[in-house]
Amino acid sequence: MTSVLPTSPGSRQSYWAATRSPRYSLTFAVPLLLLYETLAVALNQGTGVGIRNGADVLLRSLAATLLGDRGPVLFGGLVALLLIVVAVRDLRRSSGGLRPRLFVLMLVESALLAVVFGFVVGVVTAQLVNALPLLTIGQAQPMEWPVVLMVSLGAGVYEELLFRVLLVSGLLLAARAILGLGTVAASIFAVTIGALIFSAFHYIGPYGDPLDLPSFVFRTIAGLAFSGLYVTRGFGITAWTHALYDVFLLAARG
C-alpha cells in the first residue's frame, strides 16, 4: 500500500514511515556491512586463521555449497549488492530523494534501543531466573577488542539476516503450510522457535559461551525482542541495534 509522507523533515510520521522503507532501512545497513567486512579482512590478514561472526561463517558455507569455491569470497559483495539494488529500486519509486539527517536520527535511535534492550532484557531475565545475567554469563575464549568489535558488527548484519529474515520467515511459512496454523499462531510459533535457535547458536564453536540457564534465557528474550523490532522497524534499525547491543554487552563483560 502506498502512503504519502508529510513534506516536513521534522515530522514524526515522516521519520517513522520513511526510515522503515527499503530505501532508508537497507541503505542504513550497508555501512555496517562494509565496516564488518573491512575489519574482518584487516584482522585476518597474515594470521592463518579466519575469525568471523558465526552466522557469517554458516552463510558462507552455504554459499560455498551453492556457488563453489568462490562462494565465500563473493558472498559479502553479493549481500551488499542485493541491499543496494533493493534500496535503489525503492528510491526510484518514491517521490523524493534521501534526507541525510534521517540516517543520523536512525543511528541515535539504534544506540538508544541498544541501551534500552540491554536493560529490559536483563531485568526480564533476572525476574525469570532470579539471577543477574551480565554476571552469570560465562566467559568464552577471550578475544581482543578489535575482534570483539568485528564480531559484534557482523552479528548485526548476518545474525539478523540469518535468524530474522531467513529463519523466522521460513518458520512462518512452514507453520502455515505444514502445521496449518493461522496468522497469529504461526507468528508466535516462528518467533519463539527462532529465538530459541538464535540463543542456542551462541554456544557453538571455540568462541561460544559455556551453556547455562541465565545466559540462555537472556539470549532467548533478546531474540524475541529483535524479532519484534524487525517487524516494526525493519532490517536497518534492527541490524544496527543488534550490533551496538552486542558491543555494549561485551564491553560490560570486559
Tell what function each PLM region has:
Residues 29-51, 121-122, 126:
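Alpha-helical transmembrane segments of multi-pass membrane proteins
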Residues 145-254:
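Transmembrane helix-loop-helix hairpins at the membrane interface
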Residues 49-66, 136-140:
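Perimembrane loop-to-helix junctions flanking transmembrane segments
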Residues 13-31, 98-112:
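Alpha-helical transmembrane segments and their helix-start/interface "positive-inside/aromatic belt" motifs
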Residues 59-80:
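Interfacial helix-start motif at the membrane-water boundary
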